[in-house]
Amino acid sequence: MYSTFFSFCAIVQEKEANCMELNVREEKLKGLFKQFQVEHNENCKTVFIDNNDPELENYLKTDYIVYLHMVDKEVRNLDLTKVNTIFVNKEYASNLENGIQDEQRILELLLKKYPNLRAVLITDKKGAYYKDKDLLIYQKELVSNFDKDLFLVKYMASELKGNSEMTSLYRGVNQ
């Protein structure tokens, strides 16, 4: 019962008066980032998008803040100055970096290419790492692939509630 619920969950934003509430609804996780496009205040638009999405270049030309999920395509030819955070799984990142397996080294190389970005590296069974130019945080061990998706949902919910990635990931380490 629980696994069915969580395997089809995504986050939906609802606004009531001056507050925003997040509700979980049952929906397939396929295209999670594309489904999770939301304005979290009047002046700031945020989009979670896969890097193979045909609309990516359009979002990079607008006032949207872009959270980029790197899935199957290189993005070096794009202007990534509007990208806030890159989400990438270890297998994909390792392929980009000539097979390197060390998570911290992969993150260093990603940030060398994209120095103003923040990166979340999602590992197979070990959890996830957050890295920016000043900070490296590890999200404790996750149990399965489904948990990797749940981690992303928690991360996005934290963003919408106004918490920074660093705060939400730090809480995850200490829970």
Regions found by a protein language model. Give the residues of each.
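Catalytic-core segment of enzymes that process non-peptidic bonds
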Residues: 5-13
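Alpha-helical scaffold segments in soluble metabolic enzymes
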Residues: 7, 109, 154-155
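Ribokinase/PfkB-type carbohydrate-kinase core domain
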Residues: 12-138, 160-171
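Short glycine/threonine-rich catalytic loop with a Thr-x-Gly-x-Asp
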Residues: 138-156, 168-172
